[in-house]
């Protein structure tokens, strides 16, 4: 079986990691955000200070983790990463914060999932660079203050509305990541193909970009899966025909919609009036959070669904799409 990949001396994991850009100048998309971030980083370096705390928010797969890593590289400081669900008690947070050196970057993914007791400990760490820890029990309880070096907290969330106002307001640099344009996705897919040493036709790149939902993570995942089909079929190049066939087998339609998206749309189509998210969740046997994070943002972006105070409503554009593609039942 022939392979369209480069020599096997490089592991698959290494190649996949290299798909991510390592500096702001190589980051495709989010142009205004990147320009502003460059200004903030340069200003912090000029003052020899830690960068102000950064909050990255937007739908999944748009590059929040990658941006956080790039920021630490641009600042030439260490990068520590954790996530909201892993910080279940104050001691967990203290263990992370006390290992930081001056100006280091601490990245907390899914920061909206921090419980309130952890948030309260984080407030003083972010504002005053210190930790107040309760020592002892009962009447002998006392507060022990631990000083921390100035550091940069970068929080990432797909659910900005779930962050408490006090925590949200402590981020001096809130940055909203938006869906990527078709042209930006084309550039990202081309770069990914080069890193993976996969030969791909221009039309195939465009086919993937059309079905990637404006999301780099999805675009690169589809590229890797299509490459699998090509290698197994003993082909040398990813053509538009092969890409289209592979994507159809993966259940991805021309708009980038998958089975869950179509089930969601069909349910709204067959239900009269606005529908609440809890009702949709029960009907589809899907978690509310998953629907709100991974399904609805793109459907709203392409004007297939509207959110109203009374619930979700299917648009005429979506009804026409479902009818044309004969997927209503």
UniProtKB/Swiss-Prot annotation:
Location of the protein in the cell: Cytoplasm
Entry GO MF terms: ATP binding; ATP hydrolysis activity; four-way junction DNA binding; four-way junction helicase activity
EC number: 3.6.4.-
Domain of life of the organism encoding this protein: Bacteria
SMART domains: AAA
Presence of the UniProt keyword Hydrolase in the record: yes
Region (Small ATPAse domain (RuvB-S)): 181-251
Binding site for DNA: 307, 312
Record-listed ATP binding positions: 19-20, 61, 64-66, 127-129, 170, 180, 217
GO biological process, one term: DNA repair
Domain notes: Has 3 domains, the large (RuvB-L) and small ATPase (RuvB-S) domains and the C-terminal head (RuvB-H) domain. The head domain binds DNA, while the ATPase domains jointly bind ATP, ADP or are empty depending on the state of the subunit in the translocation cycle. During a single DNA translocation step the structure of each domain remains the same, but their relative positions change.
Family of the protein in this entry: Belongs to the RuvB family.
Subunit (UniProt): Homohexamer. Forms an RuvA(8)-RuvB(12)-Holliday junction (HJ) complex. HJ DNA is sandwiched between 2 RuvA tetramers; dsDNA enters through RuvA and exits via RuvB. An RuvB hexamer assembles on each DNA strand where it exits the tetramer. Each RuvB hexamer is contacted by two RuvA subunits (via domain III) on 2 adjacent RuvB subunits; this complex drives branch migration. In the full resolvosome a probable DNA-RuvA(4)-RuvB(12)-RuvC(2) complex forms which resolves the HJ.
Function: The RuvA-RuvB-RuvC complex processes Holliday junction (HJ) DNA during genetic recombination and DNA repair, while the RuvA-RuvB complex plays an important role in the rescue of blocked DNA replication forks via replication fork reversal (RFR). RuvA specifically binds to HJ cruciform DNA, conferring on it an open structure. The RuvB hexamer acts as an ATP-dependent pump, pulling dsDNA into and through the RuvAB complex. RuvB forms 2 homohexamers on either side of HJ DNA bound by 1 or 2 RuvA tetramers; 4 subunits per hexamer contact DNA at a time.
Protein name listed in UniProt: Holliday junction branch migration complex subunit RuvB
Gene source species: Wolbachia pipientis subsp. Culex pipiens (strain wPip)
């Amino acid at each position: 079986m022939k392979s369209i990949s480069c020599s096997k001396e490089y592991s698959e994991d290494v190649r996949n990691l290299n798909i991510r850009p390592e500096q702001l100048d190589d980051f495709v998309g989010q142009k205004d955000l990147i320009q502003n971030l460059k200004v903030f980083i340069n200003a912090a370096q000029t003052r020899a200070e830690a960068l102000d705390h950064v909050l990255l928010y937007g739908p999944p797969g748009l590059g929040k983790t990658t941006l956080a890593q790039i920021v630490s590289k641009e600042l030439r400081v260490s990068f520590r990463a954790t996530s909201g669900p892993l910080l279940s008690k104050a001691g967990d947070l203290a263990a992370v914060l006390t290992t930081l050196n001056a100006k280091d970057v601490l990245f907390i993914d899914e920061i909206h999932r921090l419980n309130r007791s952890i948030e309260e400990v984080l407030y003083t760490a972010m504002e005053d660079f210190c930790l107040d820890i309760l020592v002892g029990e009962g009447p002998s309880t006392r507060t022990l203050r631990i000083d921390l070096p100035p550091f940069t907290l970068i929080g990432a969330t797909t659910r900005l509305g779930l962050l408490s106002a006090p925590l949200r307001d402590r981020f001096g640099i809130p940055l909203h990541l938006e869906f990527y344009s078709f042209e930006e996705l084309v550039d990202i897919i081309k770069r990914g193909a080069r890193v993976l040493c996969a030969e791909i036709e221009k039309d195939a790149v465009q086919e993937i970009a059309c079905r990637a939902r404006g999301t780099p993570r999805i675009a690169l995942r589809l590229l890797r899966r299509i490459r699998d089909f090509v290698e197994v079929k003993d082909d040398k190049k990813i053509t538009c025909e092969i890409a289209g066939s592979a994507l159809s087998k993966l259940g991805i339609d021309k708009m980038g919609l998958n089975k869950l998206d179509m089930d969601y749309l069909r349910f709204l189509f067959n239900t009269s009036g606005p529908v609440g998210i809890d009702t949709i969740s029960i009907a589809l046997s899907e978690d509310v959070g998953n629907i709100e994070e991974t399904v609805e943002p793109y459907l709203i972006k392409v004007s297939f669904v509207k959110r109203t105070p009374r619930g979700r409503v299917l648009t005429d554009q979506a009804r026409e799409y479902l009818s044309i593609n004969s997927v209503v039942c």
